[in-house]
């Protein structure tokens, strides 16, 4: 039995801490190049040790997030980490169902309520319009273009940047 702590629930999904019991399911997701090509840090070919490093609870001072599940089925991962960067990946079978928007909206609400970050950011490779669309639906504003490293593709790629301020925050 998985004793991971639940972080949040939505109508259809749950976000809970990742544990070593999640390695096989997370590695199956990371074994689809079409998924990891849209991430900055996940390697290709898939590396089980890297997956295992991501399948452990995130220390509270480092971020918030973990495994996205629908019932007992793991559908992906989502987190806010570092300097308030939102990251997520879903198994391809679960693209186009609104899961990314649903879990990220709840994670954003929890993150701002938590008070550790007053601004979130996200970076999306320009050839990943689906994630850019999710961020815009979530209220993110698009910033300047830049480049970002893509471990799975082994190169720097053109990147779109997005930011979202906490409700009520006024910036000078």
PLM segments and residue spans:
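Conserved GNAT-fold acetyl-CoA-binding loop/helix
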Residues: 34-55
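Acyl-donor (CoA/ACP) binding surface of acyl/acetyltransferases
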Residues: 1-38, 65-172
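A generic alpha-helix propensity feature with a strong bias for hydrophobic helices
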Residues: 46-49, 60, 161, 170
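An amphipathic alpha-helix signature
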Residues: 20-27, 48, 52, 56
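Short loop/turn motifs at secondary-structure junctions and domain boundaries
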Residues: 56-62
């Amino acid at each position: 039995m998985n004793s991971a702590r639940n972080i949040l629930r939505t109508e259809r999904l749950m976000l809970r801490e990742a544990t070593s019991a999640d390695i096989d399911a997370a590695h199956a997701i990371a074994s689809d190049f079409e998924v990891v090509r849209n991430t900055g840090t996940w390697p290709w070919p898939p590396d089980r040790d890297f997956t295992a490093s991501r399948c452990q609870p995130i220390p509270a001072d480092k971020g918030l997030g973990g495994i996205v599940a629908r019932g007992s089925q793991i559908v992906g991962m989502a987190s806010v980490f570092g300097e308030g960067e939102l990251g997520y990946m879903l198994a391809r079978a679960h693209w186009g169902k609104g899961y990314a928007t649903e879990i990220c909206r709840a994670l954003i609400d929890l993150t701002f309520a938590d008070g550790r970050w007053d601004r979130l950011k996200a970076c999306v490779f320009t050839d990943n319009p689906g994630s850019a669309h999710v961020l815009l639906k979530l209220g993110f504003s698009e910033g300047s273009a830049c480049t970002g490293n893509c471990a799975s593709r082994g190169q720097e790629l053109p990147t779109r940047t997005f930011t979202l301020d906490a409700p009520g925050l006024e910036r000078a």
